[in-house]
């Protein structure tokens, strides 16, 4: 496979939008519930095998970078950490149908859209690599992770070793409270997809049971607490049982892109 790095000027962005009107477009992100994601992945695989649809585009988040077995002739990935870029490249020509598969790494800096937070740190670590680095070389990946975790000391940014360093004062309880493998302030919301609303009615009638909650997990979307508060302010959320929330405004969940955090009522008012 090969990589190309391109800077995307604003004129090319608008041109790409026009070109993308051709063919079939599908979306994949965690704003879709697991059942919706699974259905879309099955649809993508079927379309890629169907020769009557020569152009199939999937606009996706990092969701596709691990554990999603789909094969495209070309991949475009916004600049990010080297590990994420290689994961995205793994969806390109993975079945070897073409002689070479190409992954384009593009920058939206001209659009003032640059990575932030953890993505910014990962992207900067990649940019610190020598310009002639072979991204497929394992030693390059070793150097990348050194840049990411060792130079900036981001591997232990919670300073966990401070609580576990002194054998005479091992603060296990404090370390346990501070440790988070994944920083997660998510609130789960049951959305309207498939037979989810029928299951919600059963939940109201029969109460919370393990088999029922296991079924409902397929129709759940996790959002940050700040986004959850937005949806509550729109009047789009109902607490059906303590700690169990349902998206009651069906317009907030789109059949193509999943849960929307925008206030569609405000948009409708602006259109009047």
Q: What are these language model-derived features?
A:
Residues 33-61:
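Conserved helicase ATPase core of P-loop NTP-dependent helicases/translocases
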Residues 6-11, 15-28, 32-34, 38, ...:
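C-terminal helicase lobe and adjacent C-terminal extensions/tails of nucleic-acid helicase motors
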Residues 1-4:
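Conserved RecA-like ASCE P-loop NTPase motor core of nucleic-acid helicases/translocases
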Residues 55-64, 68-72, 187-192:
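Beta-edge loop/turn motif
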Residues 57, 74, 102-104:
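Structural motif
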């Amino acid at each position: 496979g090969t990589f190309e790095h391109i800077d995307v000027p604003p004129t090319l962005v608008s041109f790409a939008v026009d070109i993308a009107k051709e063919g079939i477009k599908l979306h994949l992100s965690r704003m879709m519930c697991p059942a919706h994601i699974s259905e879309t992945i099955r649809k993508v695989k079927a379309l890629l095998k169907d020769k009557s649809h020569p152009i199939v585009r999937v606009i996706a988040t990092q969701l596709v970078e691990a554990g999603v077995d789909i094969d495209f002739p070309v991949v475009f990935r916004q600049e990010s950490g080297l590990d994420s870029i290689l994961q995205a490249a793994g969806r390109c020509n993975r079945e070897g149908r073409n002689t070479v598969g190409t992954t384009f790494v593009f920058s939206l800096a001209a659009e003032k859209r640059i990575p932030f937070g953890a993505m910014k740190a990962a992207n900067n670590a990649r940019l610190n690599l020598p310009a002639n680095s072979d991204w497929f070389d394992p030693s390059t990946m070793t150097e990348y992770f050194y840049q990411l975790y060792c130079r900036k000391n981001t591997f232990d940014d919670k300073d966990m070793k401070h609580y576990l360093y002194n054998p005479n004062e091992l603060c296990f309880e404090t370390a346990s409270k501070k440790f988070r493998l994944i920083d997660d302030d998510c609130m789960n919301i049951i959305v309207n997809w498939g037979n989810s609303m029928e299951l919600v009615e059963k939940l109201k009638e029969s109460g919370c049971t393990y088999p029922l909650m296991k079924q409902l997990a397929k129709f759940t979307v996790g959002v940050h607490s700040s986004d959850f508060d937005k949806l509550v302010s729109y009047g789009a959320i109902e607490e059906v049982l303590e700690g169990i929330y349902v998206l009651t405004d069906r317009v907030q969940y789109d059949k193509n892109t999943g849960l929307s955090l925008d206030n569609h009522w405000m948009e409708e008012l602006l259109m009047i």
